Amino acid sequence: MVLTAGDKANVKTVWSKVGSHLEEYGSETLERLFVVYPSTKTYFPHFDLHHDSPQVRAHGKKVLSALGEAVNHIDDIPGALSKLSDLHAQNLRVDPVNFKLLNLCFVVVSGTHHPTILTPEVHVSLDKFLSAVATALTSKYR
C-alpha cells in the first residue's frame, strides 16, 4: 500500500503525541502483546515480563524508537529499518506474524491515550504505515 501525503500527515500527527512517551507507551504495547498473545513471550525468556519491568520498559522504548525512525524516514521505511530487518530475520528469527500483532497492540495503546486523534481516517493511515513497517521488517526473511 502506498502512503498518500494525507496518510503521512496523519502518521506524523499521531507520532507528535506518541513520540514523547516512548518508554511508557512502548512498555504498555509490549505488556498488551504478552497478555493478549501469550505465545509472543517465547521470544523473551530472559525478561522479567511483569508489569512495569525495567526490561520491558527498556525494550518498549527501543521498539517505539525504531517506529520513530520509520516515521522520520517515512519515504524510505525499508532503508530506515534495513539493519533491524536483518537482525530479526537472521539472528532473532521472529515469526513475521508477530509484527502484525505488535501493530494491533500499538494502535490500541495510541487510541487509549489519544482517543480524539484516532479518527477512522487516521486509523486507516496508521494501519497502512504499520503495515509498511511490518513489510520492511520481514523483507529479509527467506
Swiss-Prot record:
> In which tissues or organs does this protein occur?
Red blood cells.
The record places domain Globin at 2-142
Q: Member of which family?
A: Belongs to the globin family.
Specify which residues bind O2 according to the UniProt entry for this protein.
Answer: H59
Q: Which PANTHER family match?
A: HEMOGLOBIN FAMILY MEMBER, HEMOGLOBIN SUBUNIT ALPHA
This chain belongs to which protein, by name? Answer: Hemoglobin A subunit alpha-1
Q: Name one GO biological process term.
A: hydrogen peroxide catabolic process
PROSITE patterns (alphabetical):
GLOBIN
Quaternary structure per UniProt?
A: Tetramer of alpha-1, alpha-2 and two identical beta chains.
Record-linked Pfam families: Globin
| UniProt function note | Involved in oxygen transport from the lung to the various peripheral tissues.
Any other noteworthy remark?
Answer: Hemoglobin A is the major, and hemoglobin D the minor hemoglobin of this species.
Q: Which GO terms describe its molecular function?
A: haptoglobin binding; heme binding; iron ion binding; organic acid binding; oxygen binding; oxygen carrier activity; peroxidase activity
Q: Which residues form a coiled coil?
A: none
Cite the binding residues for heme b: H88
Give the species. Aldabrachelys gigantea
CDD domains, alphabetically?
Answer: Hb-alpha-like
Swiss-Prot/TrEMBL keywords: Heme, Iron, Metal-binding, Oxygen transport, Transport
- Residue stretches spanning the membrane: none
**Top-level taxon of the source organism:** Eukaryota
Give the CC-aspect GO terms. Answer: blood microparticle; haptoglobin-hemoglobin complex; hemoglobin complex
